[in-house]
């Protein structure tokens, strides 16, 4: 089956932002104006197409990244309500991501497979904590982006304030390509700085848009920002810079070409404005997606590793061998869905592929593309496509699927560690099996959700990214798996690390009692590593003192020993273990003996290396009326918080601080009572920090160590 839309006319984009900036409403308007839906869905009515889980519709928040395919033809500048005559049609695959920090993995895995992002900002709130997190995630994967300043109809809307915040707080080269005409109730149109034309909205549903002259009172402002636009574009290209110096302006075609180049390279972030809820600015946003965000062929070829360890890249082309990344798993009444991004080649229904991450074959029995929770069966997925495979057996998030005859492993995605745990137990004995199945299914879908068993109490422990994350998962157990569970109080995910390096620590496991014995012997150095690195293993074995086949088992033993530290049984992080020496026995040595020796060496080294306890620190932003600021700051100090600054606008003060997670449980209730219900806060994980000695001693005593 031939490709219906050339790859150059495909856009894989995400819509990401802080919670309540209007991402889902923006997505709904995109679907409405592109003709995929004929009635506008609203988040607050629970009718949004992309919010299809029961909890999403009840809470008015997006939890999972819904993938949707739609089409768009550029508008006619002379008649902005209509498509441009003879203009080609583009395919746009959209992922609507959650803004709540507890669902950060959904944003992370979306960023990994997208080519471009619309970052939505609230015209009043501007750059908020989760905006910064989303921006960092987009930076991690070098995703080009455009900024859409939404809610221009809100009281206090200020486009240029958001422009300055993006430049200052996100350190991005934001360049307005539009200016709003009016604000709040008076927001009635947009000035297009590329075409130097105003567009006025004549009706409520944003379908009757008319070109108009630029308002007289805006001419100075428009001239100022047009000059900034031209200068920013000229700086992306030497030929344009020469033209700019010669003529002091650039043509519409030059500006569009320069903006596209600058956006794709990450040098420029074009800024647009509108009000998705009031149906203004969305068609121009879609035009900008087509004009400035990359197609799969505009981005660098995806890098991967061959079975022999050498690097290879795969271009976005149907002629290359097939390769794809599984970025999300989902179960529902129809079965298991594995969402994939095809990077190269063609995937056809009825064929076999290799899961190169696990070295297992998978049969492709059914392929679908999605309109939120509606599935459309297709016979194939091609390079650049986002789609889903039904019924894969062994594939999980981050796995590579590829052609059996051209194996490759693509770079996976960053998965943050959970910071909060609770104990769960079934309410009745009849629910025991159902609970186990439910937890397995949910953990398969969500890599930030972990399930473990406490060895001392035998309780089932679930861990996740925050209280809301775990609350929603427990809710899903009841709705989707019909399991009622009792949930314990939240527990902090502490960690352990070391403060000083130790060298040549021995681990020796010897058993000789008739017959074949056991012999494993390793010597390691242990040292602190950079914060955030987790665990690193290095082998400096030379001359075969430890044979190659025993180095892997020794590393495995060391890694497993890190899962339970020496102070209070919490995982050891941010350490580097180097295997420097050892010995073996021709007959008695075995993989198991070296695994045990590695574990013994790590435990002994950690005891000698001045171990210490770490706790998760949260980045907290509180918004309160000025009258309550003193109480809020006093409360943050009482919670062992570290103040980082505050600013006041329009009678509301934003207080920024870092606070230990252990001190933040129940804060939502406390902040409401301290501010007569007028204070709100957001928090997200920042980093791990050493626990003060007096508090650490109490935690260690409670856990009695885990020698």
Curated annotation (Swiss-Prot):
Give the highest taxon in the source lineage: Bacteria
tr-type G domain boundaries: 8-297
Q: Which residues bind GTP?
A: 17-24, 96-100, 150-153
Q: Which UniProt keywords apply?
A: Cytoplasm, Elongation factor, GTP-binding, Nucleotide-binding, Protein biosynthesis
Q: What does this protein do?
A: Catalyzes the GTP-dependent ribosomal translocation step during translation elongation. During this step, the ribosome changes from the pre-translocational (PRE) to the post-translocational (POST) state as the newly formed A-site-bound peptidyl-tRNA and P-site-bound deacylated tRNA move to the P and E sites, respectively. Catalyzes the coordinated movement of the two tRNA molecules, the mRNA and conformational changes in the ribosome.
Transmembrane portions of the chain: none
Please provide, in alphabetical order, the Gene Ontology terms of the cellular component aspect for this entry: cytoplasm
UniProt lists the family membership as follows: Belongs to the TRAFAC class translation factor GTPase superfamily. Classic translation factor GTPase family. EF-G/EF-2 subfamily.
Q: Which organism is it from?
A: Synechococcus sp. (strain JA-2-3B'a(2-13))
Keyword Amino-acid biosynthesis carried by entry:
no
The protein's matches in NCBIfam families, at most eight in alphabetical order, are given as: EF-G, PRK12740.1-5, small_GTP
The taxonomic lineage of its organism, from the top, reads: Bacteria, Bacillati, Cyanobacteriota, Cyanophyceae, Synechococcales
- Name the gene for this chain: fusA
Query: Under what name is this protein listed?
Result: Elongation factor G
Signal sequence, start to end: none
Q: Which GO terms describe its molecular function?
A: GTP binding; GTPase activity; translation elongation factor activity
Compartments it resides in: Cytoplasm
Which biological process terms from the Gene Ontology are attached to this UniProt entry?
ribosome disassembly
Q: What PANTHER family does the annotation carry?
A: RIBOSOME-RELEASING FACTOR 2, MITOCHONDRIAL (PTHR43261:SF1), TRANSLATION ELONGATION FACTOR G-RELATED (PTHR43261)
